[in-house]
């Protein structure tokens, strides 16, 4: 049901804005700083005992990404055969970037299984073995976006897994996609969407090297926006 609601929001004139305020006991406050783009904002406050972080996101509205879609022949030729084939499948019938992103999501959902094993995470390797973790998902999606001339960058941080009001920050990787007109959006190839359950880490701080920390939910809210 949740996946269906996210799909309907992604393709409707409506978007969902979610806000999550958390307190985390991180002993490395230099790991985080304020950050924002077109579908996410993170504001960090140092408080006694840790950090209070205000997180706000908007549902990724694929319907609004009606940018022209075209294969970049030179970029495509530079990719391994497995990536070229994946590009053809993900882009089948696509007329816009929104179509292509949806195609990438469907392709990954059907062709790549999540696996935490210590396997190669390069795009071609993940496609060949049919499995990978968040780094592999991000690498495949980044390669497929490059095939159509869309720049992106990997983002390191944490996904906030929640249970009974407490949050467990899990090391994670996703993409920031650069759109025409200077717009930037987050896209998570593994979870197929983006929400306020993320903490963005500063560059140069691999999340997996950070001492495990935890937190609690301070407040939350959601609202539907008609755009």
Segments the model singles out, each with a brief description of its role:
Residues 9-61:
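Intrinsically disordered, low-complexity N-terminal segments that are enriched in acidic
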Residues 39-46, 152-154, 209-227:
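Generic structural motif
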Residues 1-6:
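Sec-dependent signal peptide recognition
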Residues 139-215:
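Hydrophobic/aromatic-rich core segments of domains that either
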Residues 53-75:
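N-terminal accessory/assembly segment that mediates macromolecular interactions
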Residues 36-39, 66-73, 189-192:
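Short intrinsically disordered coil segments
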Residues 67-132, 140, 207, 217-227:
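Secondary-structure boundary elements
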């Amino acid at each position: 049901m949740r996946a269906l609601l996210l799909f309907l929001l992604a393709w409707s004139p409506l978007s969902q804005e979610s806000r999550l305020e958390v307190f985390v006991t991180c002993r490395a406050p230099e790991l985080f700083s304020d950050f924002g783009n077109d579908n996410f904002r993170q504001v960090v406050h140092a408080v006694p005992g840790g950090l209070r972080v205000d997180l706000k996101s908007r549902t990724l509205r694929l319907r609004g990404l009606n940018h022209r879609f075209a294969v970049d022949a030179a970029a495509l030729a530079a990719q391994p055969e497995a990536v070229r084939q994946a590009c053809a499948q993900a882009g089948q019938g696509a007329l816009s970037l929104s179509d292509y992103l949806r195609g990438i999501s469907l392709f990954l959902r059907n062709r790549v299984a999540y696996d935490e094993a210590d396997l190669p995470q390069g795009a071609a390797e993940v496609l060949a073995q049919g499995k990978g973790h968040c780094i592999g998902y991000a690498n495949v999606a980044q390669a497929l976006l490059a095939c159509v001339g869309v720049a992106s960058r990997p983002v390191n941080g944490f996904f906030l897994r929640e249970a009974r009001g407490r949050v467990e920050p899990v090391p994670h990787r996703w993409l920031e996609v650069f759109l025409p007109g200077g717009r930037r959006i987050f896209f998570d190839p593994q979870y197929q969407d983006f929400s306020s359950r993320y903490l963005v880490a500063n560059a140069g701080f691999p999340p997996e090297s950070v001492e495990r920390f935890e937190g609690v939910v301070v407040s939350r809210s959601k609202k539907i926006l008609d755009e």
